[in-house]
């Protein structure tokens, strides 16, 4: 779950910037699908966790894999992603060549976006 100060506002940003689809909405807790993966947003309320702006640093690193990481990051940057924004570049990894870049969303969460997941080898074919 990503801690955010205002779950409805964050859900709107993720929808507009990352193409998120809302799965369900309880007000302060919202379920989304981003790049085919379920993501939960929640507003902390003095229960032992907090969002990055109050912590003063990122509290999570989100990894997303998609067909076009350049476009995914481009949409995020155009919608206001700032901070640790790095363009997509090629990485030589044990599972093969992998293109990856990153950005920080307006809520302080660090996102890494790549084109090839090392976990893909474990996913059964459809």
Predicted regions and their residues:
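Vicinal oxygen chelate
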Residues: 1, 11-104, 114-126
